[in-house]
Amino acid sequence: MCIRDRFKGSHTALITPFDGKSIDEKSFSSLIDFQISEGIHGLVPVGTTGESPTLSHEEHKLAVEICVEETAKRVPVIAGTGSNNTDEAIDLTMHAEKAGADGALVVTPYYNKPTQHGLYSHFEAISKATTLPIIIYNIPGRSIVDMNTKTMRDLFKIKNIVGVKDATSDIPRVYETKTTIGENFNQLTGDDATTLAFMVYGGHGSISVTSNIAPKLCSEFMKHCLDQNFAKASEINDKLMPLHHALFVESSPAPVKYAASKLGLCKDDIRLPLTSISDETKQLVDKAMKHASLI
């Protein structure tokens, strides 16, 4: 199986359940089993949705280990291993490989604003330290820097850099990336609301926040997209769209953690500086969950 096929489909950007000041390991394991039983195609622990900025290094590594062990190779695990410190990203990536992850999701360095040359050098250094397939996580809305398609094309020449999680919401870029780099460069969207358009333009899948609470709907939606049955996909998308909106009214993952707590998947615990959502937002999430027949 080629790398592109290995990582296509609907992947869940997993939340990290907490119990007070600790990771709720039991709820995390149960969430993973729930995802797989509902048909999700892959799991992504300790990314943005997993609150990686507020996890200690020990917690970060523990979450990867739990996910890999509980998944037991039933679906691919793409571990979040990014940092704005190249040495730290290398350490997290090497740990993910040792733990048994199937791939690494590496965010573009945030805050320190590297040039395109700096971005290339950062990913090149990480690639030399691991044999894991690396997926670039391009999210300029959070990291400030935006990796262009030329830099991605150059990085794709490195054997184990295999694709991008594109969280730009820039749909024409899907076509630009495909024509600049080629169809074997794996394109996964990180924006739930534009996933349908992303797939129409030639995407290979998604890394989704919404699928934390609606894995069955999201995986069925993605199956129709991959089968080029966009009429059926659109029907499911209509069920999910209010949820895609409501889960981002306040800073993610606060809304999806509330929604997950409504389903009994975890407690509504989130770490500062993020806070639990307002009552007004809770009403929006509840309404969207009802629209999707989740409650």
Give the residues covered by each predicted segment:
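Alpha/beta enzyme core
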Residues: S29-L43, I90-A104, F123-T131, T149-V162
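Hydrophobic faces of well-ordered beta-strands that scaffold small-molecule active sites
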Residues: K8-L14, G42-P45, V77-T81, A104-V106, ...
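C-terminal alpha-helical cap/extension of soluble enzyme domains
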Residues: G9-P17, F34, E38-I40, T49, ...
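Short, small-residue-biased leader/transition segments that mark boundaries at the very start
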Residues: M1-I3
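Catalytic alpha/beta core domains of metabolic enzymes, predominantly
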Residues: K128-A129, R142-F248
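Alpha-helix-loop-beta-strand connector modules within alpha/beta enzyme cores
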Residues: T54-A79, L119-I136, T180-I181
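Conserved, mostly hydrophobic/aromatic
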Residues: S22, Q35, C67, A96, ...
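Glycine-rich, proline-tolerant flexible connector loops at the mouths of alpha/beta enzymes
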Residues: I40-I66, T81-D87, V106-G118
